[in-house]
Amino acid sequence: MDSLTTHPATAQQARAFTSPSSLSFPGGTAFPGGADLTPPSDKDANMATNGQSANGNVNGQQQGANAANGNGVMPATPAATPGASAPGSGIVPTLQNIVATVNLDCRLDLKTIALHARNAEYNPKRFAAVIMRIREPKTTALIFASGKMVVTGAKSEDDSKLASRKYARIIQKLGFNAKFTDFKIQNIVGSCDIKFPIRLEGLASRHHNFSSYEPELFPGLIYRMMKPKIVLLIFVSGKIVLTGAKVREEIYQAFELIYPVLSDFRKV
């Protein structure tokens, strides 16, 4: 996925993910902690896509932590305080970004595309893809010489597919034998505001197997849920970002699972 991160695993990746220039989460400017986006290396991107951090496999770290607690079994999802009621939150996260990939099934001359297409830029010394934008649906495409394309910025699955087809059509009109194959949604990002402040220190301490919190590097807590496999960025203000989903239902499910946990750590 090149410079797009789906599972930010470190404070540095989370800062890049929520930066104003981020393609992973275009709505990141609404959240604290924005920073200039520095595209991770291919290795870092692959690790992030696989839900790993630079320190190793998240699953292994968490299983090891549980074994140290004498448990030896990795819980699939977080749990609220025993006996606490878990009513529905009544909150539906808003989809902020959908990242999809497409195979145009032909080699592309990126210089030709950049010269003749509107709203296209190409700086091979900086990034090995043409960056193209369209206004409707408002999206950005990363187009590679191999014929692979990444489309980001759509707010719905239908818009993502429509935008991808429009980009493919633009490439066809430039004389390339482009096809529209292997369309696949790679990541869905959602966000919401639970409208109450959260004690992040307490959450990080109680749920250390799932959490990473380094406020001097990034103001949000990184919470790695295992089932569904979603990463949540949780801010003291009560704003939440959820990423890593393949279908929108995973965003909704993850939020309903985390909501009673966050209620346990509500600031009073």
Curated annotation (Swiss-Prot):
Pfam families per UniProt: TBP (PF00352)
Compositional bias annotation for Polar residues: 1-24
Region (Disordered): 1-86
Sequence ranges of Low complexity compositional bias: 50-86
UniProt-listed PROSITE patterns: TFIID (PS00351)
Entry keywords, A to Z: DNA-binding, Nucleus, Repeat, Transcription
SUPFAM superfamilies: TATA-box binding protein-like (SSF55945)
Keyword Transcription annotated: yes
UniProt-listed InterPro entries: TBP (IPR000814), TBP_CS (IPR030491), TBP_dom_sf (IPR012295), TBP_eukaryotic (IPR033710)
Keyword Flavoprotein: no
Predominant localisation class: nucleus
Residue intervals passing through the bilayer: none
Single GO MF annotation: RNA polymerase II general transcription initiation factor activity
GO cellular component terms given for this protein: nucleus
Sequence repeats: 95-171, 185-262
Localisation per UniProt entry: Nucleus
Any one biological process term the GO annotation gives: DNA-templated transcription initiation
Role this protein plays: General transcription factor that functions at the core of the DNA-binding multiprotein factor TFIID. Binding of TFIID to the TATA box is the initial transcriptional step of the pre-initiation complex (PIC), playing a role in the activation of eukaryotic genes transcribed by RNA polymerase II.
Family: Belongs to the TBP family.
Subunit annotation: Belongs to the TFIID complex together with the TBP-associated factors (TAFs). Binds DNA as monomer.
The protein's name: TATA-box-binding protein
Organism for this UniProt entry: Emericella nidulans (strain FGSC A4 / ATCC 38163 / CBS 112.46 / NRRL 194 / M139) (Aspergillus nidulans)
